[in-house]
Amino acid sequence: MPIVRLLIYLFPLVLLGCLNFGDDIELVGSEITGKEMIQVSELTGLTFPNGTKSIGYYFQGSGIDDALSLKVSIPEGTKDEFLKNEIFQNGNKSKASIQIGRSRSWWKLDELQDRVDVNLQLPKGKYAECTLGKEEGNWVAYISWTST
């Protein structure tokens, strides 16, 4: 009987060890292509104004649940356009809590001034957060997304 019990406990661990998870990907600046921006738009529902510049992208695919973070610079004069996104219109106004990118050198969320924090529960167990604020005189958005 103890051997059967041991096998019952070990089986899930062995099974988890056999699962094939993805890779973690970090891109900075010009390494971030339209492909990543389209991915973020599709996952979060965000649309970015023309002239938006990518600063940092981190996709965490090595865990059980995928997650990503993105930092972009929003052109001066397009802040109101960006604020028309659903997450700002219908999301909960509360401080960002996921911060998948917080271990990245480009993730400086705590330095933002005049910030607007929102989050939104998405269909099928997905969740997005966005924080918009001023960083070194520029409008910057920090976006986190996770699938649970």
Give the ranges of each region predicted by the language model.
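Short glycine-/small-residue-rich flexible loop motifs, especially phosphate/cofactor-binding loops
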Residues: 10, 38, 80
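Sec-dependent signal peptide recognition
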Residues: 2-12
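Bacterial signal peptide processing site
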Residues: 19-21
